[in-house]
Amino acid sequence: MSLRVATTAALALVASASLGATRPDGLGDVVDIQHWSYPAFSRVVIQLSEPALATVGEVPADPAGDKPARLYFDVPGMWVGRRFATPIRVGDGLLRQVRVGQNTLDTARVVLDIERYGRHRVMELAAPARIVVDVFAPRQQAGGAGGGRAEQHGAPEHGAELLPMDLRPVRVVVVDAGHGGRDPGAIGVGGLREKDVTLALAKTLRKSLRARGFEVVLTRDRDRTLSLEERTAIAEGAGGDVFVSVHANASPRAELAGVELFTLQENAERQTLRLAARENGVAPAEVDPLQRLLARLRLTEAGARSSLLAKQVHREIASGMGERWPSAREPALKQGPFYVLYLSDMPALLIEAGFVTHRDDAYRLRDPEYLRAMAEEIAKGVERFRDEVAPLVAERRP
């Protein structure tokens, strides 16, 4: 994605009909616009029918003309049509509205009218093609006006401080129960559904983390459908300091078993790519383009801190579960291209708690005592990260 700063104060959105011609051949579509709002964070997702490289521009506010600051995205090869003739009202204290129109005959334009602005982040994702735009409040204003749905998820007020990640205390843990609602996830032995395992483990993990003084936000506490973008929007909106996504694995090879922990990495084994394809909701053939996309990832403190977090959790699971469940296999620590980790701007970890397709693993994943033991070890690892590792990272900051 290319970036440029607009120098003109005018941003025209031309209605498709006024261009005087029928839709040109070979264009894709702007399929949908979604948004999620929180006090210090807003996310807009521009869904496209096919991948496209957008140009990003910024226009400062014009108080004399009563025009807000704007971010705009020119998306070549896209057609808008009439469905977006009316602006999409946001009104969350950060974004006023989203406007969509045809900039030229073969280029769509999406404009974000901004009320408050600190910084923004743009990510292009594939399968399905979409552009994810995150707008953050100014640091000194974070936690102010802005409404939004974070309150429904128990977001703590301090979570919007927006300090550099390696200077923030680790207080809020966001636990993401994978899949849910229309998406059952993997289905294994005896009809065991991944979405049921993840929800049970997430709720149990919440108890273990709270017992250690953490504030905990669940992305879902019931059987409901959530997109990957919404899961991480909940995490960002809650001011999460750590993001833990829990899943259950599956394989056509019934002998595969054990716990696996993943941090983000674009280069991965073929088996991990197949797993990432399932968790990302893309076909295996689409994972290699996904790898090329993730190859452009920024290398931030969050990435390094994710590895440190994973090592602590892995150590606790390996020692604690090995003592209490000697038949369970040694957990593996791996890396893979998971969207849910890419979309999070905080230390993030994805845990596959076992294989629903393995007889013994499936039996354990149905056992509340096993899930309690797993939750305890995960919580111990996060606690160790908070108390021992994170402070050392902050001390080493130049």
Predicted regions and their residues:
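Signal-peptide-cleaved, periplasmic/extracellular N-terminal interaction regions immediately downstream
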Residues: L19-V173
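Flexible glycine-/small-residue-rich
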Residues: L48-E50, V75-G77, I114-R116, D134-A137, ...
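Catalytic-core regions of hydrolytic enzymes
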Residues: G148-K311, R315, E323, Y363, ...
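Hydrophobic anchor at the start of a short beta-strand
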Residues: A54, V216, A348-I351
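Bacterial N-terminal signal peptides
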Residues: A6-A17
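Short glycine-rich, acidic/polar surface loops and turns
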Residues: Q97-V98, P331-L350
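Histidine-centered active-site loop/cap adjacent to the catalytic His
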Residues: L371-R386
